[in-house]
């Protein structure tokens, strides 16, 4: 979830794990670890899975035979989708740290910039290189993919520079950025329900993390209502556009069973249960926020797997399910190595 990369959830001091690894690492290994922490790539698995889902669904539907994603070799499509997702994810994370450097010196001194493990100029190079890589990968999917990537980059810049200080705008911006990123491989995709779920998931996670972490300004009743109105507007636009563009062929992908929506609903319910358990067992609200952000980023891969199963693409669903397992393992390992969590938008938004 690209939008989530903008969410900066500081790791609580009581749960930072072993930080000695960052002290003894030097040379290439130390630079790699610092880059991983700066870009929060351990949480990019969900964002990659989002784009891979659209690649798989588009290639299984002959209605998109005119699109580059349909004609390109599968390895090329998957590689370009992954680069686009990782690039935008890393761009948002690096941009967040650059613009929040002063704040992090006081409240998150373990981050790479305030800790002095990377200079501001180097972080800027990482951000720009990540953005250029994502744009280069997106253009492979056509002009529409490139335009969407530029829009997402603009939304990430808007969020980090201003919108995150206005909850009514920032929370929705995270969701919209996540949905837009997902559509990069096929901007003509009419089955927009997965993108809507991604937008809703990212917005909900961003809201919960914002509240648990005690961010300021607080979400007032007025801000909550405005954010809700924004979510409704973009939901109607996203789903309505998909329905309007597929009046003859149908909204649902061919071959989908009548019970297809049940699987994503089950995945959503399971995530709700996981969130409740993690929040209740957390030692502090900030630890709870970190866990919600981490599991929220991972869960996108599970959603993608469930959508593939629902649409009859069982082997692809198994593959993305395994990818989600790898993502969880990677996040767990890197969490211990880095001693702090990385978090987007939380493209996660």
Please place each PLM-identified region on the residue numbering.
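Alpha-helical transmembrane segments of multipass membrane proteins
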Residues: 50, 88, 92, 134, ...
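Multi-pass membrane catalytic core of lipid/isoprenoid biosynthesis enzymes
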Residues: 80-85, 101-156, 160, 172-175, ...
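C-terminal membrane-associated helical module and adjoining short loops/tails
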Residues: 2, 7, 12, 17-36, ...
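Helix N-cap and loop-to-helix transition residues
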Residues: 73-74, 119, 142, 220, ...
């Amino acid at each position: 979830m690209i939008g989530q990369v903008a969410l900066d959830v500081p790791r609580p001091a009581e749960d930072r794990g072993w930080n000695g690894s960052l002290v003894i690492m030097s040379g290439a290994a130390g630079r790699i670890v610092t880059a991983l922490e700066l870009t929060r790539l351990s949480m990019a698995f969900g964002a990659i899975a989002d784009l891979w889902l659209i690649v798989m669904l588009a290639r299984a539907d002959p209605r998109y035979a005119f699109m580059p994603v349909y004609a390109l070799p599968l390895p090329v499509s998957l590689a370009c989708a992954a680069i686009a997702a990782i690039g935008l994810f890393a761009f948002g994370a690096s941009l967040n740290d650059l613009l929040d450097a002063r704040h992090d010196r006081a409240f998150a001194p373990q981050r790479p910039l305030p800790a002095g493990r990377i200079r501001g100029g180097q972080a800027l190079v990482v951000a720009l290189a990540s953005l250029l890589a994502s744009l280069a990968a997106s253009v492979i999917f056509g002009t529409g993919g490139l335009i969407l990537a530029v829009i997402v980059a603009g939304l990430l810049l808007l969020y980090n520079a201003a919108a995150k200080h206005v909850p009514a705008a920032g929370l929705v911006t995270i969701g919209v950025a996540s949905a837009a990123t997902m559509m990069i491989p096929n901007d003509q995709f009419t089955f927009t329900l997965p993108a809507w779920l991604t937008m809703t998931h990212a917005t909900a996670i961003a809201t919960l993390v914002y509240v648990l972490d005690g961010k300021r300004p607080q979400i007032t009743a007025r801000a909550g209502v405005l954010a809700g109105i924004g979510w409704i507007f973009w939901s109607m636009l996203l789903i309505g556009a998909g329905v309007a563009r597929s009046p003859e062929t149908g909204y649902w992908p061919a071959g989908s069973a009548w019970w297809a929506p049940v699987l994503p609903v089950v995945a959503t319910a399971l995530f709700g249960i996981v969130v409740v358990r993690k929040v209740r067992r957390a030692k502090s609200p900030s630890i709870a926020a970190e866990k919600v952000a981490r599991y929220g980023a991972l869960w996108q891969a599970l959603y993608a797997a469930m959508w593939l199963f629902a649409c009859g693409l069982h082997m692809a669903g198994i593959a993305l399910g395994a990818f989600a397992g790898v993502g969880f393992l990677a996040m767990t390992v890197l969490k211990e190595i880095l001693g702090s969590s990385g978090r987007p938008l939380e493209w996660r938004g």
